């Protein structure tokens, strides 16, 4: 009898030990899961930050974020316009696969797997704040002729976001509910904010006034606070409208640039106002003691709409690079890119590793332990950046492919292949280099893309052409639905 009791006590001890070890392992796993925030500006050019060399623009918070984290010297938007890029952020796949090849058309296919859905399965709470642009938010109205309200109805809540405060497309950067500032031809509240499926019809009455970037952050921060209070890891997408048109600067920000022309004042004011909200976000993360293990990303959705010599408020700068929004030359797709993650990234790091918005999905999946190869029928264009983050390096294992708006491109570690489907120079090409059907550039020696090497290095060009054609063929299969069968 004594022996039996001893055995029972031993078994009870084993069970309790297993329970507490399992609980400890769960708590460790919970603590190890980083929060994830994807911040994105709209039409912000490579040269539109202080840390990238702008001599006038005040972006102290982005500059501080770049100093505190990993600054990408070759970070690319997934496309040269916004809707396709936004889809790459959430799916890890190029727009040629998920069906939105340009802005204001179509919707993200329902067969796609979104970052919010996967993270929801992993216990994350997900929120989207700001510009959506991946479908309509109303099933009976859209302000864009290229979208069918019923057929293209797709809200953030339909792809895994628990909370959302979003607009279908761009709104004014100041007082978006003022009819005088309407982005569309006429004012309609359905083109402004929707909150969890309900149209915010009277934003003036609910305090949605002043700086639009602040309005967005005013909604994002309570979401983060709530998740932290509930000890739930969070995934937060903050997609600003700034500095997309209508570009309207607030009085206090305009006053920061007294020596500039009115057009430059407004553009600079809008960027500085956005930067201020990045500062609020970073301060809140520190206040909540979650900054250490939060992956905070920042980028832009494409290059600048205009250029510093424009006779309007489109005063964005692509820096030294050729091209701007709508172009697959560097100025249209190379954008500011920063990752701040103190738990994994030492302050002051810079990298020349080519990275792209499609890399967000596989990188985060790598961190949370989701095995992408399980779905062998679904090609992913992005790559996990965790090896770069943990060990460094400059060589990307696979080139980045682009397509859209009459151009195709393949960008490797050194060489970039450009395919112009038309030899007519686009209005988005502000470069001085030649424009032929096929072009090859050495981005290390010639980042401005001025010297076409296609005749000098035919073997390199042919190899890249073959790789590009294989990728285009794969995308065509995806477009026809092969990935969803």
Question: Which role fits each region the language model picked out?
Answer:
Residues 2-4, 20, 33:
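Intrinsically disordered, low-complexity segments
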Residues 28-439, 443, 447-485:
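Formylglycine-dependent sulfatase
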Residues 2-16:
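Bacterial N-terminal signal peptides that target proteins for export
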Residues 4-6, 23, 39, 44:
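Short linear motifs centered on Gly/Pro in flexible linkers and helix caps
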């Amino acid at each position: 009898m004594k022996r039996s009791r001893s055995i029972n006590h031993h078994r009870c001890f084993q069970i309790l030990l297993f329970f507490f070890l399992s609980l400890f392992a769960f708590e460790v796993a919970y603590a190890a899961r980083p929060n994830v925030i994807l911040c994105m500006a709209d039409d912000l050019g490579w040269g539109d930050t202080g840390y990238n060399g702008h001599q006038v623009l005040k972006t102290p918070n982005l500059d501080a974020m770049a100093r505190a984290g990993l600054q990408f010297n070759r970070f690319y938007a997934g496309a040269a316009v916004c809707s396709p890029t936004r889809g790459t952020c959430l799916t890890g796949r190029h727009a040629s696969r998920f069906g939105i090849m340009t802005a204001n058309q179509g919707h993200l296919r329902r067969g796609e797997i979104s970052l919010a859905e996967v993270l929801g399965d992993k216990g994350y709470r997900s929120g989207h704040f700001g510009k959506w642009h991946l479908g309509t938010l109303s099933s009976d109205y859209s302000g864009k002729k290229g979208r069918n309200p019923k057929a293209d109805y797709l809200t953030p809540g339909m792809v895994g976001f628990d909370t959302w405060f979003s607009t279908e497309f761009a709104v004014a950067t100041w007082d978006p509910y003022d009819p005088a500032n309407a982005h569309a031809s006429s004012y309609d509240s359905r083109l402004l904010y929707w909150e969890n499926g309900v149209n915010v019809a009277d934003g003036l009455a609910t305090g949605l006034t002043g700086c639009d970037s602040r309005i967005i952050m005013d909604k994002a921060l309570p979401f983060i606070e709530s998740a932290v209070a509930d000890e739930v890891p969070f995934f937060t997408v903050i997609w600003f409208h700034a500095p997309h048109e209508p570009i309207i600067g607030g009085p206090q920000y305009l006053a920061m640039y007294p020596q500039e022309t009115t057009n430059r004042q407004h553009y600079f004011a809008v960027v500085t106002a956005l930067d201020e909200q990045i500062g609020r976000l970073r301060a809140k993360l520190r206040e909540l003691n979650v900054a250490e293990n939060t992956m905070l990303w920042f980028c832009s959705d494409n290059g600048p709409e205009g250029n510093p010599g424009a006779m309007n408020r489109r005063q964005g700068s692509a820096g030294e690079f050729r091209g701007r929004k709508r172009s697959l030359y560097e100025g249209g797709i190379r954008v500011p890119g920063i990752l701040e993650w103190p738990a994994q990234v030492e302050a002051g790091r810079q990298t020349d590793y080519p990275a792209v918005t499609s890399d967000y999905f596989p990188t985060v999946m790598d961190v949370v332990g989701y095995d992408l190869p399980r779905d062998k029928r679904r090609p992913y264009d992005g790559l996990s950046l965790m090896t770069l983050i943990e060990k460094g390096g400059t060589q990307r294992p696979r080139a980045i492919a682009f397509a859209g708006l009459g151009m195709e491109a393949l960008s490797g570690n050194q060489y970039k292949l450009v395919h112009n489907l038309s030899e007519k120079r686009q209005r988005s090409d502000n470069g001085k280099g030649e424009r032929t059907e096929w072009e090859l550039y050495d981005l290390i020696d010639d980042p401005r893309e001025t010297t076409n090497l296609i005749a000098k290095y035919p073997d390199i060009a042919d190899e890249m052409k073959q790789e590009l054609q294989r990728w285009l063929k794969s995308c065509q299969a995806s477009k026809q639905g092969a990935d969803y069968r």
